[in-house]
A protein has these predicted regions:
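Conserved acid/base catalytic micro-environments in cytosolic active-site loops
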Residues: 1-21, 25-41, 47, 51-55, ...
């Protein structure tokens, strides 16, 4: 196995990003530890063989990012995830597991339970410099996002329109699955307007993601198909890498797919979806921007507001990463900032057309 390289980085946060490793494999712990210790902007606080030891460690030290294996004997990483979130006091959990190689189900279950991101762990002999570069990038993005969230500037909310909603568009990224679960659990079935969703995920995950949304929401969810009518009360999901756009044909909203380039380089992207929703629904369009890194959704949100529609964002306290919603709020585009369940209550009060 190649020795991990020492990566020289320029600290962007003023202090190293602190990391805790949880993996029952001694070989994996040693390899991951060397990778962390080989980066100037990261600091390894501890490497433990199970969730119970991790919770003990978290009582003594505070970390920014937790690397979590899912497949561990006894108390699995997936089962322990909720308690690790509590013990971590705001730490972001990056699932680093071989399970993430084999399919979407375990990965999406971890994301729905509150993991911020996932990374497929290669076999022991392939924990090399290429993997180290990807791992370090994921850790630093999560760590920087968390520290940026804490330093975010105040913002002013716009007046909230009171018109009924003809089309609801939701965008999310990091931490989005748990936020969507909370939102749809609180959205009554009496809300019957069409719903379109763009969640940053690999295209191969989208069918299972749609199935999960169906179970979460108690309403039919499906991956968008070119030319299919977007029915009331249903959830249509952007397929990736193509974006989901909405056109209008008579009284019907219709799904269109696009591979257009975007400023955010997200595929699928929230921005083109919102721009199309603004065009077809105007003042009866509502966009919700949930937790996620980056600025995807800000340009689209400006189009929604310009068309007379309204934009709601997840608040900082409940977001895994307040990048996307924070960008929209600080641009002065949001009329509501709240936890997902409260956002659902706002939508329900507005009602459907």
């Amino acid at each position: 196995m190649n020795a991990p390289a020492r990566i020289m980085c320029t600290p962007a946060t003023g202090r190293p990003i602190s990391v805790l490793i949880i993996d029952d494999s001694a070989v994996a712990r040693a390899s991951l530890s060397r990778m962390i210790e080989g980066v100037d902007t990261l600091r390894l606080e501890a490497a433990v063989d199970g969730a119970a030891r991790a919770i003990t460690a978290l009582n003594e030290v505070h970390v920014d990012v937790i690397l979590l294996d899912l497949e561990m004997p006894g108390w699995s990483g997936l089962a322990a995830l909720p308690e690790l979130l509590v013990a971590g006091r705001g730490a972001k959990i990056l699932v680093v597991s071989s399970t993430a190689r084999s399919g979407a189900e375990a990965t999406l279950r971890a994301l729905a339970a509150g993991a911020a991101d996932t990374l497929a762990k290669p076999e022991a002999g392939h924990l090399n410099q290429a993997f180290q570069s990807v791992l370090v990038d994921r850790i630093e993005r999560l760590g920087r996002a968390m520290l940026h969230d804490r330093a975010a500037s105040p913002f002013v909310l716009r007046d909230e329109p009171v018109t009924a909603i003809s089309l609801l568009a939701i965008g999310a990224s990091t931490g989005g699955l748990s936020a969507l679960a909370a939102f749809f659990a609180a959205l009554p079935r009496s809300f019957t307007s069409p719903i379109v969703v763009t969640q940053h995920l690999p295209p191969s995950f989208m069918p299972y993601f749609a199935d999960q949304l169906s179970a979460m929401a108690g309403r039919f969810a499906h991956v968008a198909q070119e030319g299919r009518i977007i029915e009331g009360g249903e959830i249509t999901v952007a397929p990736g890498p193509d974006h989901l756009l909405v056109t209008r044909e008579g009284a019907d909203f219709v799904a269109r797919l696009s591979d257009q380039s975007t400023a955010t380089r997200c595929y699928p992207s929230v921005d083109p979806m919102l721009a199309s929703v603004a065009e077809v629904a105007g003042p009866r369009a509502v966009a919700i921007i949930l937790t996620g890194m980056g600025r995807d959704g800000t340009q689209g949100a400006s189009r929604i507001v310009a068309a007379g529609g309204s934009v709601l964002v997840q608040d900082r306290a409940s977001s895994a990463v307040w990048g996307m919603p924070g960008s929209v709020a600080q641009a002065g585009l949001a009329c509501v900032a709240a936890a997902p369940a409260a956002l659902a209550a706002h939508v329900a009060r507005r009602g459907a057309v």
